[in-house]
Amino acid sequence: MRTDERRRWWVKPKKHITLVFITITMIIQFQMKGCVSCVETERMGLLQLKSYLKNLVDAEEEEEEGLSILKSWTHHEGDCCRWERVKCSDAINGHVIGLSLDRLVPVAFESQTRSLNLSLLHSFPQLQSLNLSWNWFTNLSDHFLGFKSFGTLDKLTTLDFSHNMFDNSIVPFLNAATSIRSLHLESNYMEGVFPPQELSNMTNLRVLNLKDNSFSFLSSQGLTDFRDLEVLDLSFNGVNDSEASHSLSTAKLKTLDLNFNPLSDFSQLKGLESLQELQVLKLRGNKFNHTLSTHVLKDLKMLQELDLSDNGFTNLDHGRGLEIPTSLQVLDFKRNQLSLTHEGYLGICRLMKLRELDLSSNALTSLPYCLGNLTHLRTLDLSNNQLNGNLSSFVSGLPSVLEYLSLLDNNFDGSFLFNSLVNQTRLTVFKLSSKVGVIQVQTESSWAPLFQLKMLYLSNCSLGSTMLGFLVHQRDLCFVDLSHNKLTGTFPTWLVKNNTRLQTILLSGNSLTKLQLPILVHGLQVLDISSNMIYDSIQEDIGMVFPNLRFMNFSSNHFQGTIPSSIGEMKSLQVLDMSSNGLYGQLPIMFLSGCYSLRVLKLSNNQLQGKIFSKHANLTGLVGLFLDGNNFTGSLEEGLLKSKNLTLLDISDNRFSGMLPLWIGRISRLSYLYMSGNQLKGPFPFLRQSPWVEVMDISHNSFSGSIPRNVNFPSLRELRLQNNEFTGLVPGNLFKAAGLEVLDLRNNNFSGKILNTIDQTSKLRILLLRNNSFQTYIPGKICQLSEVGLLDLSHNQFRGPIPSCFSKMSFGAEQNDRTMSLVADFDFSYITFLPHCQYGSHLNLDDGVRNGYQPKPATVVDFLTKSRYEAYQGDILRYMHGLDLSSNELSGEIPIEIGDLQNIRSLNLSSNRLTGSIPDSISKLKGLESLDLSNNKLDGSIPPALADLNSLGYLNISYNNLSGEIPFKGHLVTFDERSYIGNAHLCGLPTNKNCISQRVPEPPSVSTHAKEEENEEEGNVIDMVWFYWTCAAVYISTSLALFAFLYIDSRWSREWFYRVDLCVHHILQFKRSSVCN
């Protein structure tokens, strides 16, 4: 016993001594690390570098944008190892080994030169990592060492020059950086042949990122100089060389990214078999199509990941089979056109090591039951196809190790039993919805699943009461989407209580009637209950219960009352949408001062009032502000100046008055300005700094005066000035904006000449000049608007002929691939809301809240067609093409070239002085829906071919001098007499005039016919002198007879005068009663 006690006595002190020794060692190391201080020469070098970078930023721009470059780099702070963006070695005299200088300098225009002086880096001989991305440098320079500048940095291994504006001129400088192992040149302006010969000395490269440049050819020398290269990224270039894969051959290459190049044939990849160590091959977004021939991949024995998404494959090679190495673990076929049968699936089902498979966004119709044999499959995405069949049976046969299953947006119908997932013990993500019907989702009430979901998507389904019972067993949910499920009653507070890690809950498009919040504070980040039927007021303590909310959408409900002040406690809130409710009152000061992280604030279509943005406002992060459709009054206050990143401002349809304040021009990033429908007045808004303005809508106000001649909006895309009181000339500078697409000047008093500065590069698609005071000829230069789709020059005083060159204008004839930016006004795609519990995968899965939030609807354009104004927006606007020249003083004939506008849908030439006949070429306008030629001087007959215009929904050729029989056949039988009135010589249906009585027998000879015509003309001559004498005699005779009759018969005379007196009495009595009323 004593021996054991002595042993225990010795062991205890030994343990204590060991702990003490470890503690002392850690303290010494910590103190030594804390004593690290940088070398003085390097400290001074950093200060010189800061000074150089600051000089690249204009002092005024720095002040306005709030830039403060490298604030901690000062003379007062001696230890530069403590400075931001600086990393030092662990030695006592620490050398600078890392500089992270990304995103310091604001965006430069393409015409601006911004040089990086490499000699400033010579002070850091131990530098290992340098990041200068996102600074928009254009070139490198070194007046001391020239191209050999990087040679002094022989420890440099990582260099990041991505997202600048470098071109090939930097290549000789890079060739001296022989120690670099990782080089990033993504998103620059490099082009030509890859790899450039000048890079032959960079033999130590392991990682080379050239994404998003313009390399189009590959050197025949290939990658022989880069023998150790393991990762090569040439995505988003123009690589289309037929010998691409031969040039890329290098023994050690493990990852090859050729995403989004114009490769079109797998035969271009024959040399891939030499890449024996290749593990990752990415060919997304190329131009491969039709059947996939994979025999060129069969020798890649190490291949583990293959990305063939975003191509045009329609099928797999059945003859050879799917010759993909069995080592494959990740296969991505999403966004192709695959329509696989059972035999087509078999090739995939032979890949027994497959762990992740994405077949989403194809044309699949049959369920791939053979996937149940893939015992290692953990990720399966079949979303956005046309799958149908017995869903419960298919799901029950899937591998038990499955973790991720997406069946969103298919053609499933009927019921789905949730307990068919009984074999799935590891399932964490489940997604289900249908495009064609409502899926009845049910489960057994007693079933308790073995899995715990993290993400559940069940949108556009019908959840039974037992299904909600299933959710009670889930305690680890992070993301829940139950939108469009016909849910009723109260907001499911229990779902929030049971899942303490819940970050996102989407309940939009249901029929919830009450919002009841949990009592305890919760970490919820995304809450969407839009488009329900909630009539409550918003609880005052909502900001206390959900202080971590980042996204809050309460729009399209029936909320009443005021906005809670406690929302100001949501310090992380980025998007707040309470539009289309019944909220009233003023904006709380606590809300305006506390939500400094807010980027999107949408309060449209409520009953809010008062003045906005006093000095208390502190919305410094605001990017988009939507206050349209309220009752705000007064003028804008300067509190908005704190929102220096404000990009979109919409205050339309309020009661703002007075002049637009000059300070609004100091919001330098303002790109979208909507102020229509107020009571603003004064001259055209003067924006001092306006390089970014894309959309300006100040219509329906009382602005007056002329537009300054020197107005300059280089980025302008849409300008709306209609329904104001502007006068004077339209400045030519407006048309110099290269991207101008919409110009609406209707209902003003502009005059003078127009369009004198238009050139063939103009992208103008919508030009509306209705109801102004233009009095000139329509200039021929207007035909240079080759992309125009809607043109309205009506209700002016244009004179002269219609230009025949209108046929050169597209009106939809030239549909190019350029997306009409006017379809989507504003996109917050850079604001993402993905939960932290996002499923980990090598696939690019679409998880979380939608990646972009677009709170602004598509552009709306009103255009007169079918005798009424129609509103066109979104994709419909893309296909609407119309020409309106009505109510002018145009003369001459309708040019036959008008028939070349074959995609036009509305043509209005009414109320002019046009003569001649209706050209037969109009019958070529097969897409025409509205034709108005009324109130002109057109003559001749109606072309019979008009009956073949099957799309015509409105026809008006009234009040002309047309003659002959109406071709009442084909589509013209749908129009009644109103389309033809005012043409005295038209006959036939639908009029009541018979054409037979007006027909003249065919003359026997030319001389007889001429004689008949002469006699007819003589017989039709009226002697006007005899006509006047006859009328006078009849009038006098009738008057004498009336007076004699009344004089002779006294009874009739008394009755006559009685009736006259009675009529006068009734008139006087009616007049008195009207005055009294």
UniProtKB/Swiss-Prot annotation:
Glycans are attached at residues 117, 131, 139, 201, 240, 289, 373, 390, 423, 460, 498, 553, 618, 631, 645, 749, 771, 908, 956, 961. Residues 39-1024 are extracellular. It comes from the Eukaryota. Residues 1046-1077 are cytoplasmic. Disruption phenotype: Lack of responsiveness to MAMP eMax from Xanthomonas. It is a single-pass type I membrane protein. Residues 971-1024 are annotated as: C-cap/acidic domain. Residues 1-38 form the signal peptide. LRR repeats lie at residues 124-147, 153-176, 177-201, 202-225, 227-250, 251-274, 275-299, 300-324, 326-348, 351-376, 378-397, 399-424, 425-449, 450-473, 474-498, 499-522, 524-545, 546-570, 572-594, 595-621, 623-643, 644-666, 667-694, 696-713, 714-737, 739-761, 762-785, 786-808, 877-901, 902-925, 927-949, 951-970. GO terms for biological process: defense response to bacterium; innate immune response. It is found in: Cell membrane. The chain crosses the membrane at residues 1025-1045. Keywords: Cell membrane, Glycoprotein, Immunity, Innate immunity, Leucine-rich repeat, Membrane, Plant defense, Receptor, Repeat, Signal, Transmembrane, Transmembrane helix. GO terms for cellular component: plasma membrane. Coiled coil: none annotated. InterPro entries: Leu-rich_rpt, Leu-rich_rpt_4, Leu-rich_rpt_typical-subtyp, LRR_dom_sf, LRR_N_plant-typ, RLP_Defense_Trigger. Residues 39-120 are annotated as: N-cap. Pfam families: LRR_1, LRR_4, LRR_8, LRRNT_2. Belongs to the RLP family. Involved in plant defense. Confers resistance to the bacterial pathogen Xanthomonas through recognition of the microbe-associated molecular pattern (MAMP) eMax. Functionality seems to depend on the presence of the receptor kinase SOBIR1 as an adapter protein. PANTHER family: RECEPTOR-LIKE PROTEIN 1, RECEPTOR-LIKE PROTEIN 14. This is Receptor-like protein 1.
